[in-house]
C-alpha cells in the first residue's frame, strides 16, 4: 500500500526568553503534584494549513486562557496588507481563521506575544476522500496492538483508512509505525502525524477536565486538515474495540443521513469471543455500545 505519509505539522511556542506564558485555569488546590510538569504553558500553535475552497488559513492550538486579550488583538499581515482575522476559544483548544486574498507563501501574525511567520501549507483533502477512517491519538502503544485494533475495525466496521496522531512515541520510529499500519490488509490510506506536544494533566476527582489540550487540538486538526471529504470517521483509543449490541456501525451509519453520531458504553468493558480472535494485548477490551443519533 503506497498511500502512506508521515506529516510534520508546523507549530510555534513562546521562546524561553518571553515574559509571557499560559497559566492554568484550574484552582491550585485542585492541581496534583505533577501538574506543572505536565501543563503546556508555552505552545501557541499546533498546526497551520490552507483551505483552498474557503481561501482561508486555519491555525490550531491550545486555548489562550490568560493570553486571550493579546490573541484577540492579533493582526495578520501579507504583502503589506492587513487581513481579516477570527479568533475562537473552544473546548480545550483554539482556532484562528485568516481570510486570505490570493495565496501568499506566508502570513505574519503580529501581537504582544511577538511576530509569528506562518507558512502556507495546503490541507490534505484527497487522501481520505470517500474513506471510512479510523482516527486516534497514540503514544507508545505496541505496533502489534495497533495492527490488531485496525484489523478488528476493518473487519467489523469497514474501516479502510487510518489517521494516527503520534504523541512522541519512543518505542519505535514514525517510519516503523507508518509501515506497520500500511501492511495491514484492507487499509488503502495511512497518515501518521507527528504530534509531539505535552498531553496535559488529566482531570482531578472526577472533574476539572480543563488542561488536557493535546487531544482536543489533534481532533480539531484532523477535522479540518484531513477529514472533510471522508465518508465516515470512527474515533476510539487503541485499547478500545467497538462492538455494538444490535448491528455493525457500518450498517447503522448507512441507514442514517450524514451526521455526527455518538455512542455510550454499557458501563463496563469485557473481552468476547469476537474480540479475542484479534487481540494479542491482554488489556484490550471490548466496549459494548449503544448507538445514538
Label each residue range with its predicted role.
Residues 140-142, 169-171, 240-243, 268:
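Short acidic, S/G/P-rich loop/turn micro-motifs used as interaction or catalytic elements
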Residues 121-124, 132-133, 170-235:
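Active-site-proximal specificity loops/subdomain of glycosyltransferases
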Residues 2-124:
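Beta-strand-enriched, solvent-exposed domains that form extended recognition/catalytic surfaces
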Residues 199-215, 223-225, 234-236, 242-293:
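Conserved catalytic core of nucleotide-sugar-dependent glycosyltransferases
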Amino acid at each position: 500500500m503506497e498511500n502512506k505519509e508521515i506529516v510534520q505539522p508546523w507549530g510555534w511556542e513562546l521562546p524561553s526568553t518571553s515574559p509571557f506564558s499560559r497559566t492554568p485555569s484550574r484552582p491550585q488546590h485542585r492541581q496534583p503534584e505533577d501538574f506543572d510538569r505536565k501543563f503546556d504553558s508555552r505552545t501557541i500553535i499546533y498546526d497551520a494549513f490552507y483551505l483552498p475552497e474557503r481561501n482561508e488559513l486555519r491555525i490550531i492550538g491550545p486555548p489562550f486562557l490568560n493570553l486571550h486579550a493579546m490573541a484577540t488583538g492579533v493582526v495578520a499581515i501579507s504583502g503589506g496588507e492587513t487581513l481579516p482575522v477570527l479568533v475562537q476559544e473552544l473546548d480545550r483548544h483554539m482556532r484562528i481563521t485568516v481570510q486570505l486574498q490570493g495565496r501568499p507563501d506566508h502570513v505574519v501574525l503580529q501581537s504582544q506575544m511577538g511576530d509569528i511567520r506562518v507558512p502556507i501549507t495546503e490541507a490534505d483533502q484527497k487522501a481520505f476522500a470517500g474513506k471510512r477512517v479510523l482516527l486516534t491519538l497514540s503514544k507508545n502503544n505496541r505496533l502489534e496492538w495497533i495492527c490488531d485494533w485496525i484489523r478488528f475495525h476493518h473487519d467489523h466496521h469497514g474501516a479502510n483508512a487510518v489517521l494516527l496522531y503520534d504523541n512522541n512515541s519512543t518505542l519505535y520510529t514514525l517510519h516503523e509505525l507508518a509501515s506497520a499500519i500500511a501492511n495491514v490488509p484492507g487499509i488503502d490510506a495511512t497518515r501518521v502525524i507527528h504530534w509531539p506536544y505535552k498531553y496535559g494533566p488529566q482531570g482531578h476527582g472526577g472533574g476539572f477536565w480543563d488542561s488536557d489540550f493535546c487531544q482536543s487540538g489533534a481532533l480539531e486538526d484532523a477535522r479540518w486538515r484531513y477529514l472533510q471529504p471522508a465518508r465516515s470517521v470512527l474515533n476510539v483509543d487503541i485499547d478500545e474495540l467497538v462492538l455494538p449490541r444490535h448491528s455493525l456501525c457500518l450498517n447503522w451509519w448507512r441507514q442514517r443521513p450524514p451526521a455526527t453520531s455518538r455512542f455510550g458504553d454499557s458501563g463496563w468493558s469485557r473481552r468476547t469471543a469476537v474480540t479475542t480472535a484479534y487481540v494479542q494485548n491482554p488489556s484490550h477490551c471490548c466496549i459494548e455500545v449503544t448507538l445514538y443519533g
